[in-house]
Amino acid sequence: MDIKSEVIEIIDELFMEDVSDMMDEDLFDAGVLDSMGTVELIVEIENRFDIRVPVTEFGRDDWNTANKIIAGIVELQNA
């Protein structure tokens, strides 16, 4: 499974929201993510992709859309 599909699946599993048609929509403004959901999302991303997401790397503006989450994962995998 590619990163995009996996991120969509993670968000759907955690928040019961299909974001495949809203890849650039702000997930906080859309009510998909909140502070607690962000923690759940980070933990799941770390487990599934075997990466560590430093708190300093996870700013709301940097990871607020599905596409930005995907880009962040790719960046951390290549670090």
Swiss-Prot record:
<feature type="modified residue" description="O-(pantetheine 4'-phosphoryl)serine">
    <location>
        <position position="35"/>
    </location>
</feature>
<comment type="function">
    <text>Carrier protein involved in the D-alanylation of lipoteichoic acid (LTA). The loading of thioester-linked D-alanine onto DltC is catalyzed by D-alanine--D-alanyl carrier protein ligase DltA. The DltC-carried D-alanyl group is further transferred to cell membrane phosphatidylglycerol (PG) by forming an ester bond, probably catalyzed by DltD. D-alanylation of LTA plays an important role in modulating the properties of the cell wall in Gram-positive bacteria, influencing the net charge of the cell wall.</text>
</comment>
<dbReference type="Pfam" id="PF00550">
    <property type="entry name" value="PP-binding"/>
</dbReference>
<comment type="pathway">
    <text>Cell wall biogenesis; lipoteichoic acid biosynthesis.</text>
</comment>
<keyword id="KW-0961">Cell wall biogenesis/degradation</keyword>
<keyword id="KW-0963">Cytoplasm</keyword>
<keyword id="KW-0597">Phosphoprotein</keyword>
<comment type="similarity">
    <text>Belongs to the DltC family.</text>
</comment>
<dbReference type="GO" id="GO:0036370">
    <property type="term" value="F:D-alanyl carrier activity"/>
</dbReference>
<feature type="domain" description="Carrier">
    <location>
        <begin position="1"/>
        <end position="77"/>
    </location>
</feature>
<dbReference type="InterPro" id="IPR003230">
    <property type="entry name" value="DltC"/>
</dbReference>
<dbReference type="InterPro" id="IPR036736">
    <property type="entry name" value="ACP-like_sf"/>
</dbReference>
<dbReference type="InterPro" id="IPR009081">
    <property type="entry name" value="PP-bd_ACP"/>
</dbReference>
<keyword id="KW-0596">Phosphopantetheine</keyword>
<dbReference type="GO" id="GO:0071555">
    <property type="term" value="P:cell wall organization"/>
</dbReference>
<dbReference type="GO" id="GO:0070395">
    <property type="term" value="P:lipoteichoic acid biosynthetic process"/>
</dbReference>
<protein>
    <recommendedName>
        <fullName>D-alanyl carrier protein</fullName>
    </recommendedName>
</protein>
<dbReference type="GO" id="GO:0005737">
    <property type="term" value="C:cytoplasm"/>
</dbReference>
